Amino acid sequence: MVPNLMTDIEKLQVQVDELEMKQAFQEQTIDDLNEALTDQQFQFDKMQVQLKFLVGKVKGFQSSNMAEESEETPPPHY
């Protein structure tokens, strides 16, 4: 009976070792994903600032270079 008990204990130890390796791999994966998400959030925030700047530029360009419809001279055929 003792040999079977050792075999069972060895099987359990192998299972525990496998679970520990899986946990370590998952922890590393979570750390990698967290770092990637942090980098993407930084890039997203930076792009939002750039977009706001460009929208302001476009609005400024449109208002300064385009006359209102009431200010436009009518076409010659009127």
Curated annotation (Swiss-Prot):
Gene3D superfamilies: 1.20.5.300. It holds the Pfam family SlyX. Belongs to the SlyX family. HAMAP family: SlyX (MF_00715). PANTHER family: PROTEIN SLYX. This is Protein SlyX homolog. The lineage of its organism: Bacteria, Pseudomonadati, Pseudomonadota, Gammaproteobacteria, Vibrionales.
